């Protein structure tokens, strides 16, 4: 390999001297290069199988013309790689096989040729392509493409790669790995891929040796049996074991275990046999384990909870001949055990000891050696058959010694033995008497009962508890762990521990130590440990580290070639040391496969490693980060994906208690789909009808609630055959006031109107007295009656899917019906009438009327069938509150007619004339009377709460509203988690909450609190409210009510809670559905939306399914097999064809530019292979063809055919912001970044993408790029206008500002102006703020004059478009360009896709800004408080800022790159830039 350089597009270019290659004709060279490159790619990616597209050399096309596998002259191959195969031999085999005669034959490598159907997009399936065509920048690349050009003396190879599939680090390693492979092939030696190293010697020393300094010599006993004997001799009367009201001292434990050991030795003289232990949690379990150990045998736990088939297999496979059990389990054991098994109970032992006790010591004096077998644990096998893991005494002793010394197990420790004994993790609980601990034996099945578990922790004053994260979460959910004051240690293991769970645990138990443990059964219980620090965990990763290896344990993280990986790189974890098991019982084949010779140990040492199958990486501090299972690594959507990484990301969501991810093949298409199962955390994500909820409260994908809302199921239905008298009321068409009343009374979920003050809340709560001229109901005309009844009807709008009402209804189901009972009113016949709200009609249901002449009464009926499909609990409560909402609306409306309402005594009413269905509820009635009649609210207690700093003059806390003032009663408030999950985002946006409690018990109290909310909602103050919780008469109080009673210290009567904030006029007068989006999405959809904000698209689940409970295995882990059997209905990705002429026109241009035959109108431009050059060409073509004036940045706001066509079709064009969203995802505050000269943001896209999804990234396009824009005259004006733009998006700081090249000056000026305005700038990053040094002597002495006669200016202008000052075309530019016209012609000649208007506009921006600089005095006046980081490019001159001191209150951080001014924003230079930035931003403790 002669050299490595960079292509104009900055892809790696390799030049290979033909004379140094073993083959000399081009066809043989092509195969040689292909096989060597494929090996190199396999080595750096760890892929052991790849699909490769080999473009036939032009000279051999005719030889292949008849082969049916060839498509478009491409040979599609499936290549497998064996890291142990000699490199030279592999290359020879491939070259021999890749001929028309041999390609379809079997071969030693297992390679094959693929037959592709027409449905396969040819280029999309390849991991690697070898092409003889030159690279074309506009063509998308799916993975890695090598373009080969043959010269007389050399081959020139240009590598184009997809950064989403190959990291820049991998591409930087590729040439060197390729060089090593070709060198090995040339020597024709025996080297394999395992001999090709990827890390240097220093890193190798670090990960192999420095991180494995765990040697520890233990003094004293050599077995745990000897440790127990020693303990019994030194502390005979100390309590060792407790079960219910029974106890064993150490002396008793040793004696009873010794008695069993004597009896076992009498039955069986051979040692190291498996003795089964078939017992329930009890003292017998403890004496059984120790008795078997003292007998010199190995115990085999046989849990009575296990299926009989599993137990039978374990007995057969282990060849067990003796089983210890309890008397009451004897018959059950005999029924499942094979013939010849000897069953031992305490009765047998007691009988034996009565005969021999006088002649026997406390325990047999067996010579138990460290290498003897201690126990056998059966663990699940991949074949479905469990496998027995053999653990020796020295391994157990090492574990117990480490627990005693490092974790602190001693005589003060009280352990709850609750883990089922058949699991590896239970063994240290059972064997802990060897450390002097007291063991409390848990009740059978206690590990499945969190409430009972907490009771035992408290009763027995347990100090140390072990549990899987799933159980830990369940214990926290009891909210009773604080009742366990003795608890000082919690060990978590068995599953990945998430940060939010660790934080919740330590916040609940601040004096308790939390230790994360890890270890496969094959390596003796716990192999690594991580003590969770309450402070640093907040800044740590979402999934906690599994820690560092324990004493006498070695961790190796290796790639697929069994070579160590660098810190931070992913590999498979191999474990060595004292904990490694002997192997699998009677499974020599599997033992040889999983227990390998330690390649890092001296030859002949006998040391072995266990291959865990777990994926992990080293942290800089020597701890290990677990990343999932190797068998959970799948190739999905072209990407290699860790299912555990996706699960871990989902579990960081605060609503998620547990998650699991599986891949399922679509039965229709055969494609793989990613399915995520989620169990919600009920404490953080409460559901309506919690515990009795339907699936629609978890997901609204089926739109069941919306369909009910549209069906008007709350209306009364009459049989067609007996249709009663129906009157069409006047006033069906609402007037403007009625529409305004209906649409301004919303359940507001957004608060865009600004801050709320204490005075605003007092004004809201102080309802003015209503004054109006009183009238009697009999004075109403039919027109007036129709007019005010219209307020009870439906309102519709072209902007809404759902109908609108003037009053609130739970679930917007409007299940409360209104009936009028009238006598002598509006000329109508006396009787009862149903008001039909959809058609604005009165339907007579009875000609009876109990009211006196001239009277009007309203009756309310709840139609339960309209609400029961959605709500299961509190149906009567919400219907009564809806009745209150209607009456509250009438309180506001009727005074305009001289009327008011008063509640009737429900007990005195007869609903018989209404002829309601038996299943419906009669709710009550109110009389319409003369004059305004607002209730006094004397029986209501009103409270206000504020949270956060939302109200400046009202500190956080809960207040009681008393006589027009607010009195502070508590600092505590109803928190976000106390409102149902789908409303929590509204809570975060709100400014305050109001609680209303009625002193009137029963249903009348619910009417009153509902009436109060409705009147408050209809306020004229632009304050919006949303109901967020209520009490229950039927025992189903919502969390907000329970929390409020905690704050008060007692329960109230009927209770209602709502939150609110200030709304804008636009919200108030809107007839749209923005506030009603909650009906469209449930927790499943909202979680998926949240995941999309920080998870790459290829990792997004196709389906998120919420389960009431995760299925669990017996040891508390998620049962993946049970999940795989759950039926999941999948939505299929369909191609949406253009639906109108405009979409057809846009699609045609789109397909032509992206070179795609099949596309959907919802396909994303950038995800479909679009880049900057294609974007320019596409927009130019659209503008020319459609006579439009689309700005370039429109593709960021409308990146699909569908959205772009909709944008074009709007009569009024929405202005496209110069704030260009380059990376929208992230939970942190955004980054605002200015591009270089010319002001076009497209070259910042790769930077935005490489930084990841932690925070959004916005580029700020220069004013002047779009047509009809004029560049700003000064930097000061540019910054001022850009600040206006930024503040529209983020009103207040702290701000993060970046600037590249010339953009660094604008970023600096913007930071200064923001600080001048009192804002905080958190960070200012200046990327390559200096100009590139111009090496040509004609331009080296450049000046700042923007003139085409100035070679320096022309060079920089050229670089704006070409991205280089060394391109060969620069010389021609300097020679031929004399003015703007000739420059525009020159650039568009080089790149015809560029529109001359765009080139001209960018040129003028460069001309305007080229001369911008600060004077000395201007810089002297500008001193920033913000921390400044300067990242210098290789070869740049000093920047404007480095020549001046004092521009920053604190010294700036200056970092230098190897990449130059232009390559730092391209691959692979971008990798160096982002690495430097991420290193700089890392917390000091994590930087190693």
Curated annotation (Swiss-Prot):
UniProt-listed InterPro entries: AA_adenyl_dom, AB_hydrolase_fold, ACP-like_sf, AMP-bd_C_sf, AMP-binding_CS, AMP-dep_synth/lig_dom, Nitroreductase-like, PKS_PP-bd
GO terms under cellular component: cytoplasm
CDD domains from the UniProt entry: A_NRPS, McbC_SagB-like_oxidoreductase
GO BP: amino acid activation for nonribosomal peptide biosynthetic process; secondary metabolite biosynthetic process
Domain of life: Bacteria
Family assignment from sequence similarity: Belongs to the ATP-dependent AMP-binding enzyme family.
The protein's name in its UniProt record: Indigoidine synthase
């Amino acid at each position: 390999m002669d050299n490595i350089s960079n292509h104009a597009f900055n892809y790696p270019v390799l030049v290979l001297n033909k004379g140094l290659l073993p083959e000399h004709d081009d066809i043989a060279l092509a195969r040689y290069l292909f096989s060597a490159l494929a090996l190199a790619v396999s080595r750096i990616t760890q892929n052991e199988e790849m699909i490769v597209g080999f473009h036939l050399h032009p000279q051999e096309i005719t030889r292949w013309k008849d082969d049916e596998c060839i498509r478009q002259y491409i040979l599609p191959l499936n290549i497998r790689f064996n890291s142990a195969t000699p490199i030279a031999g592999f290359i020879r085999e491939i070259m021999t096989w890749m001929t028309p005669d041999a390609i379809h034959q079997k071969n030693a490598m297992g390679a094959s040729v693929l037959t592709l159907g027409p449905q396969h997009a040819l280029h999309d399936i390849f991991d690697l392509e070898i092409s003889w065509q030159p690279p074309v920048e506009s063509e998308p690349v799916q993975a890695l493409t090598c373009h080969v050009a043959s010269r007389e003396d050399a081959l020139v190879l240009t590598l184009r790669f997809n950064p989403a599939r190959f990291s820049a680090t991998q591409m930087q390693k590729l040439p060197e790995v390729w060089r090593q492979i070709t060198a090995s092939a040339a020597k024709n030696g025996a080297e394999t891929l395992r001999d090709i190293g990827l890390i240097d010697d220093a890193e190798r020393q670090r990960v192999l040796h420095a991180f494995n300094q765990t040697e520890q010599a233990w003094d004293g006993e050599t077995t745990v049996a000897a440790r127990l004997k020693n303990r019994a001799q030194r502390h005979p009367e100390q309590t060792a074991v407790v079960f219910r009201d029974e106890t064993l001292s150490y002396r008793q434990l040793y004696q009873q275990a010794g008695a069993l050991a004597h009896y076992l030795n009498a039955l069986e003289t051979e040692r190291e046999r498996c003795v089964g232990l078939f017992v329930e949690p009890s003292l017998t379990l403890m004496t059984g384990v120790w008795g078997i150990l003292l007998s010199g045998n190995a115990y085999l736990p046989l849990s009575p909870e296990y299926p009989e088939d599993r137990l039978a297999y374990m007995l057969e496979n282990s060849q067990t001949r003796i089983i210890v059990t309890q008397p009451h389990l004897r018959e059950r054991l005999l029924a499942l055990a094979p013939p010849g098994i000897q069953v031992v109970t305490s009765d047998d032992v007691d009988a034996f000891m009565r005969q021999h006790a006088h002649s026997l010591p406390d325990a047999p004096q067996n010579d138990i050696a460290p290498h003897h077998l201690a126990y056998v644990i059966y663990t699940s096998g991949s074949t479905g058959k469990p496998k027995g893991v053999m653990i020796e005494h020295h391994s157990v002793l090492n574990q117990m010694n480490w627990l005693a010394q490092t974790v602190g197990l001693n005589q003060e420790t009280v352990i709850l033995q609750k883990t089922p004994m058949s699991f590896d993790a239970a063994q240290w609980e059972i064997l802990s008497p060897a450390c002097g601990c007291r063991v409390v034996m848990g009740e059978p099945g206690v590990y499945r009962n969190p409430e009972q578990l907490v009771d035992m922790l408290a009763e027995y004053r347990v100090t140390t508890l072990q549990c899987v994260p799933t159980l830990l979460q369940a214990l926290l959910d009891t909210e009773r762990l604080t009742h366990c004051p003795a608890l000082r240690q919690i060990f978590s293991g068995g599953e990945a521990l998430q940060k939010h769970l660790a934080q919740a645990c330590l916040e609940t138990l601040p004096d308790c130590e939390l230790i994360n443990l890890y270890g496969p059964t094959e390596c003796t219980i716990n192999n690594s440990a991580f003590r969770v620090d309450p402070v640093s965990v907040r800044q740590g990763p979402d999934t906690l580290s599994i820690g560092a290896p324990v004493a006498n344990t070695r961790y190796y993280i290796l790639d697929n070639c069994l070579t160590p990986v660098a810190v931070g790189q992913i590999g498979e974890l191999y474990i060595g040391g004292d904990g490694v098991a002997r192997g699998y019982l009677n499974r020599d084949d599997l033992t040889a496969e999983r227990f390998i010779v330690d390649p890092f140990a001296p030859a002949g040492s006998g040391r072995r490693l266990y291959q865990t199958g777990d994926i992990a990486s080293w942290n800089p501090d020597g701890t290990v980060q677990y990343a999932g299972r190797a068998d959970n690594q799948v190739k999905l959507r072209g990407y290699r994906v860790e299912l555990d990484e996706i699960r871990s990301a989902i579990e960081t969501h605060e609503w998620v208690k547990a998650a699991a991810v599986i891949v399922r093949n679509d039965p229709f298409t055969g494609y793989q789909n990613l399915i995520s199962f989620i169990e919600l955390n009920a404490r953080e994500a409460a559901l309506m009808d919690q515990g009795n909820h339907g699936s629609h409260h978890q997901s609204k994908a089926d739109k069941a609630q919306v369909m009910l809302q549209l069906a008007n199921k709350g209306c009364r239905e009459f049989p067609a055959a007996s249709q009663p008298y129906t009157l069409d009321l006047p006033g069906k068409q609402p007037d403007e006031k009625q529409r305004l009343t209906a649409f301004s009374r919303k359940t507001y979920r957004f608060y865009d109107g600004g801050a709320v003050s204490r005075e605003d809340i007092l004004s809201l709560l102080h309802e003015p007295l209503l004054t109006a001229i009183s009238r009697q109901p009999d004075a109403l005309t039919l027109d007036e009656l129709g007019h005010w009844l219209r307020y009870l009807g439906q309102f519709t709008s072209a902007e809404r899917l759902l109908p609108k009402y003037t009053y609130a209804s739970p679930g917007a189901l409007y299940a409360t019906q209104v009936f009028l009972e009238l006598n002598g009113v509006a000329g109508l016949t006396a009787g009862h009438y149903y008001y039909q709200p959809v058609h604005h009609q009165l339907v007579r249901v009875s000609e009876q009327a109990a009211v006196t002449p001239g009277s009007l009464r309203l009756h309310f009926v709840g139609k339960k069938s309209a609400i029961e499909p959605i709500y299961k609990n509190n149906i009567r409560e919400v219907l009564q509150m809806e009745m209150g909402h209607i009456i509250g609306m009438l309180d506001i409306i009727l005074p305009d007619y001289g009327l008011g309402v008063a509640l009737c005594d429900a007990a005195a009413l007869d609903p018989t004339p209404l002829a309601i269905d038996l299943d419906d509820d009669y709710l009550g009635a109110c009389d319409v009377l003369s004059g305004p009649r607002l209730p006094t609210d004397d029986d209501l207690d009103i409270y206000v709460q504020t949270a956060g700093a939302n109200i400046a003059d009202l500190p956080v806390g809960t207040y009681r509203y008393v006589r027009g003032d607010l009195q502070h009663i508590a600092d505590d408030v109803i928190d976000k988690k106390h409102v149902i999950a789908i409303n929590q985002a509204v809570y975060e946006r709100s400014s305050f909450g109001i609680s209303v409690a009625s002193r009137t018990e029963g249903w009348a109290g619910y009417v009153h609190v509902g009436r109060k909310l409705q009147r408050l909602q209809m306020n004229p103050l632009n304050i919006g409210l949303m109901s967020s919780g209520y009490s229950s008469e039927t025992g189903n109080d919502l969390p907000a009510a329970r929390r409020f009673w905690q704050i008060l210290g007692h329960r109230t009567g009927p209770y209602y809670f709502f939150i609110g904030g200030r709304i804008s006029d636009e919200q108030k007068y809107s007839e749209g559905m923005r506030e009603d989006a909650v009906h469209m999405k449930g927790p499943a959809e909202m979680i998926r939306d949240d995941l999309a904000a920080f998870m790459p698209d290829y990792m997004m689940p196709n389906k998120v399914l919420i389960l009431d409970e995760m299925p669990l295995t017996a040891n508390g882990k998620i049962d993946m097999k049970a999940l795989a059997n759950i039926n999941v209905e999948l939505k299929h990705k369909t191609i949406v064809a253009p639906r109108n002429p405009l979409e057809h026109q846009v699609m045609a241009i789109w397909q032509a530019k992206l070179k795609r035959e099949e596309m959907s109108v919802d396909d994303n431009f950038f995800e479909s292979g679009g880049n900057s050059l294609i974007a320019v060409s596409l927009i130019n073509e659209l503008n020319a063809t459609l006579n439009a004036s689309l700005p370039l940045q429109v593709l960021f706001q409308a990146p699909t055919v569908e959205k772009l066509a909709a944008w074009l079709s709007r009569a009024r064009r929405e202005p496209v912001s110069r704030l260009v969203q380059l990376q929208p995802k992230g939970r942190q505050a955004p980054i605002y970044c200015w591009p270089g000269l010319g002001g076009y943001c497209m070259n910042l896209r790769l930077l935005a993408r490489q930084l990841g999804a932690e925070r959004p990234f916005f580029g700020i396009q220069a004013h002047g790029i779009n047509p009809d824009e004029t560049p700003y005259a000064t930097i000061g004006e540019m910054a001022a206008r850009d600040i206006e733009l930024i503040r529209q998006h983020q009103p207040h700081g702290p701000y993060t500002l970046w600037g590249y090249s010339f953009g660094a000056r604008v970023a600096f000026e913007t930071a200064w102006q923001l600080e001048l305005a009192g804002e905080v700038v958190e960070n200012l990053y200046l990327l390559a703020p200096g100009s590139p040094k111009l090496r040509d002597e004609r331009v080296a002495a450049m000046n700042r004059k923007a003139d085409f006669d100035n070679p320096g200016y022309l060079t920089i202008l050229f670089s704006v478009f070409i991205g280089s000052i060394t391109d060969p075309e620069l010389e021609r530019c300097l020679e031929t360009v004399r003015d703007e016209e000739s420059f525009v012609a020159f650039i568009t000649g080089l790149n015809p896709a560029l529109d001359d208007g765009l080139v001209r506009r960018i040129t003028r921006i460069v001309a305007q800004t080229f001369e911008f600089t600060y004077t000395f005095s201007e810089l002297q006046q500008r001193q920033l408080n913000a921390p400044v980081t300067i990242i210098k490019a290789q070869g740049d001159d000093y920047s404007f800022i480095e020549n001046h001191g004092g521009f920053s209150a604190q010294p700036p951080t200056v970092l230098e790159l190897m990449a130059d001014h232009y390559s730092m924003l391209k691959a692979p230079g971008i990798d160096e830039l982002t690495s430097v930035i991420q290193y700089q931003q890392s917390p000091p403790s994590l930087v190693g």
